[in-house]
Structure formats: structure tokens, C-alpha cells
């Protein structure tokens, strides 16, 4: 047996034994893995910045975050569209583009992926942490390392300013994302979509990260914050700013995503001619997958699950959605 045949036999065995039939569960698995990749790269870049005394280097952080998002979108883009962000998923559900059941399941997967990625980075840099802080975990200060995992606001930032910061940044994020996935707009081709999203994150970080790090993603902030609490950083991970900060990246991001979705629909989406408002503005990628899966079951199509990504792109022309 040749090597190539051996590989095919191994892949066929793996598919037979472990392929998941539920499209929803497949989506959750993809979101989990993609967010894990996103957070490992994002937190890894933050760790490198802190250990090399580049804590305030916005360009370093911005390009690291942008490239992390690009890689993560490539991971799950063909399966779910790569939401990667509970706030984005909620916004798409509000617009009727993602079933609420899928939204909630994806959110759980995203938080789990972010938490386990935080554990992975802690293990990866455990020795470096001990050298840097002498084994005494600190949240803030010269030897503080909690910013590897979560965002913390500048001392001058008020609670009101922090909330506006998160709403404004996430609204801009979703406005541009919706423009990229709108069939009637100048959306990038699927293969270039992750690059475009990465560039969006770069410019958002450069322009808006000074106040509080531009979290713009609840799973990117809350799950790692929970991890740092468990890992020995103490209650200061939540008590910073008198307990007026830790919930802002969660609530503000969700609010901002919904605001941004409404703004895009008002100024762009609702302005297309009525003839152009076809199913591209009302159907989600996952709902299309589910319809195809049901049809395949009725027709007893044995090979339906072998290449759902290619079927998704060629038959439906839908691009990935993010983030």
C-alpha cells in the first residue's frame, strides 16, 4: 500500500469513527477551536509585549491582534462563518441572520475556547511569569501580568467613558463586518475575507485601544478574567475601578454590536432596491447548512458530509461572517 493510500485509509477511518452528524455541534466545535486559536495568538502577543517591555507599543499589539483574528477566521470560516465573538453572534441573531439556538450554543463554545486558551498560555509562559514577577502574581503595576489575558482601563477613564468606549468600538466593528458580508456591497471574496477582517482589527486597535485595550469581544475578556482569578491573581481582576469595569467589555460590546447592526441596516441595508432584498439579507450560513442536511437525509445522499464547505460556497455564494 502506498503512503497516499495509507493516509486516505486513516482519514476514512477517522471520519467513520468520529464524524459528527449534528451540524449545530459541528459549528460549536469549529467556534471552540477558532476562538482557542484566536486567544492563544492574542494572549501570546500580549505576553511577548509585556516580557520584552513593550507594554505600551500599540502597533505591536494591533498587528498581533489583527493577525490572530485572520488566522482564527481561516479556521472556522467555512463551517460557521467564524463569528468568534458572542456580541457579533447576538447582532446577527437580532438581524435574523443566525438562529438564536445557534447563537447561544456558539457563545458557550466561544467562552470555553477562550478559557482553555488562557490556560494554555499560562502553561506556556509559566516559567517566564515566575522570572518576571518573582512568583507573586500581580494584576497592575510594573510587574503586573494580568493584562496578558484581559483588558484594564487607564486610570483616568470614568465608568461612563469606559461604556462609551466599548459601545463605540464594537459598533464600528459590526458596521464594517456587515458591509463585508453584504452581497450587494463590495464584499471581499471568501479567501480574502479573513485578511480584510484582520486589517479591520488592526485599525480598530490602533485608533481605539488607548483608553482600555479595545476588547470588543466578551469572550476575549471575561473568560480570561475568570481564568486569572482562578490562577491566583485574586479578586483585583474584578475589583479594579471599584468593580465598575469588569462587566463593561461584556455589556458594552453586546450593546455596541446591536447599535452597529441597526445603524448599518438604517443607512445601507434598508436602502437597497426592494428587488435586491433577497434571501441574502435574511438567511444565515447555518440555516442554509441545516436545510441542505435535511434534504440530503430525505434523499439518502451518502456523501453529503464529505465536503460541506465546498457545497456551501459553490451553491450558495455566501461569504464568511466573522469574528
Swiss-Prot record:
<feature type="transmembrane region" description="Helical">
    <location>
        <begin position="74"/>
        <end position="96"/>
    </location>
</feature>
<dbReference type="GO" id="GO:0005886">
    <property type="term" value="C:plasma membrane"/>
</dbReference>
<feature type="transmembrane region" description="Helical">
    <location>
        <begin position="193"/>
        <end position="213"/>
    </location>
</feature>
<feature type="glycosylation site" description="N-linked (GlcNAc...) asparagine">
    <location>
        <position position="143"/>
    </location>
</feature>
<keyword id="KW-0677">Repeat</keyword>
<dbReference type="GO" id="GO:0016323">
    <property type="term" value="C:basolateral plasma membrane"/>
</dbReference>
<dbReference type="Pfam" id="PF00230">
    <property type="entry name" value="MIP"/>
</dbReference>
<feature type="glycosylation site" description="N-linked (GlcNAc...) asparagine">
    <location>
        <position position="292"/>
    </location>
</feature>
<dbReference type="InterPro" id="IPR000425">
    <property type="entry name" value="MIP"/>
</dbReference>
<dbReference type="GO" id="GO:0015250">
    <property type="term" value="F:water channel activity"/>
</dbReference>
<dbReference type="GO" id="GO:0015254">
    <property type="term" value="F:glycerol channel activity"/>
</dbReference>
<feature type="transmembrane region" description="Helical">
    <location>
        <begin position="32"/>
        <end position="54"/>
    </location>
</feature>
<comment type="function">
    <text>Aquaglyceroporin that may modulate the water content and osmolytes during anhydrobiosis.</text>
</comment>
<feature type="transmembrane region" description="Helical">
    <location>
        <begin position="103"/>
        <end position="123"/>
    </location>
</feature>
<protein>
    <recommendedName>
        <fullName>Aquaporin-2</fullName>
    </recommendedName>
</protein>
<feature type="short sequence motif" description="NPA 1">
    <location>
        <begin position="85"/>
        <end position="87"/>
    </location>
</feature>
<feature type="transmembrane region" description="Helical">
    <location>
        <begin position="243"/>
        <end position="263"/>
    </location>
</feature>
<feature type="transmembrane region" description="Helical">
    <location>
        <begin position="161"/>
        <end position="181"/>
    </location>
</feature>
<keyword id="KW-1133">Transmembrane helix</keyword>
<keyword id="KW-0812">Transmembrane</keyword>
<dbReference type="InterPro" id="IPR050363">
    <property type="entry name" value="MIP/Aquaporin"/>
</dbReference>
<dbReference type="InterPro" id="IPR023271">
    <property type="entry name" value="Aquaporin-like"/>
</dbReference>
<comment type="similarity">
    <text>Belongs to the MIP/aquaporin (TC 1.A.8) family.</text>
</comment>
<keyword id="KW-0325">Glycoprotein</keyword>
<keyword id="KW-0472">Membrane</keyword>
<keyword id="KW-0346">Stress response</keyword>
<feature type="short sequence motif" description="NPA 2">
    <location>
        <begin position="217"/>
        <end position="219"/>
    </location>
</feature>
<keyword id="KW-1003">Cell membrane</keyword>
<keyword id="KW-0813">Transport</keyword>
Amino acid at each position: 500500500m502506498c503512503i497516499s493510500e495509507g493516509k486516505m485509509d486513516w482519514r476514512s477511518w477517522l471520519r467513520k469513527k468520529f464524524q459528527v452528524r449534528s451540524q449545530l455541534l459541528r459549528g460549536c466545535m469549529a467556534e471552540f477551536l477558532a476562538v482557542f486559536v484566536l486567544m492563544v495568538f492574542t494572549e501570546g502577543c500580549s505576553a511577548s509585549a509585556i516580557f520584552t517591555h513593550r507594554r505600551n507599543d500599540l502597533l505591536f499589539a494591533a498587528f498581533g491582534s489583527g493577525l490572530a483574528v485572520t488566522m482564527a477566521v481561516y479556521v472556522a470560516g467555512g463551517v460557521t462563518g467564524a463569528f468568534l465573538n458572542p456580541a457579533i453572534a447576538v447582532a446577527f441573531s437580532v438581524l435574523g441572520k443566525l438562529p438564536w439556538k445557534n447563537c447561544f450554543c456558539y457563545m458557550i463554545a466561544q467562552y470555553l475556547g477562550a478559557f482553555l486558551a488562557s490556560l494554555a498560555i499560562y502553561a506556556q509562559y509559566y516559567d517566564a511569569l515566575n522570572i518576571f514577577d518573582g512568583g507573586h502574581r500581580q494584576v497592575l503595576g510594573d510587574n503586573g501580568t494580568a493584562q496578558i489575558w484581559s483588558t484594564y482601563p487607564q486610570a483616568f477613564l470614568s465608568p461612563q467613558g469606559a461604556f462609551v468606549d466599548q459601545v463605540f468600538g464594537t459598533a464600528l466593528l459590526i458596521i464594517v463586518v456587515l458591509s463585508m458580508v453584504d452581497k450587494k456591497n463590495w464584499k471581499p471574496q471568501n479567501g480574502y475575507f479573513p485578511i480584510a477582517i484582520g486589517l479591520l482589527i488592526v485599525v480598530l486597535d490602533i485608533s481605539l485601544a488607548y483608553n482600555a485595550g479595545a476588547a470588543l469581544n466578551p469572550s476575549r475578556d471575561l473568560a480570561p478574567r475568570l481564568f486569572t482569578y482562578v490562577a491566583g491573581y485574586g479578586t483585583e481582576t474584578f475589583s479594579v475601578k471599584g468593580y465598575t469595569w469588569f462587566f463593561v467589555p461584556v455589556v458594552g460590546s453586546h450593546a455596541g454590536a446591536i447599535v452597529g447592526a441597526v445603524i448599518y441596516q438604517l443607512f445601507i441595508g434598508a436602502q437597497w432596491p426592494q428587488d435586491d432584498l433577497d434571501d441574502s439579507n435574511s438567511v444565515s450560513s447555518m440555516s442554509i447548512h441545516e436545510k441542505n442536511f435535511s434534504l440530503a437525509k430525505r434523499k439518502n445522499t451518502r456523501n453529503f458530509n464529505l465536503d460541506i464547505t465546498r457545497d456551501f460556497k459553490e451553491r450558495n455564494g455566501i461569504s464568511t461572517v466573522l469574528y
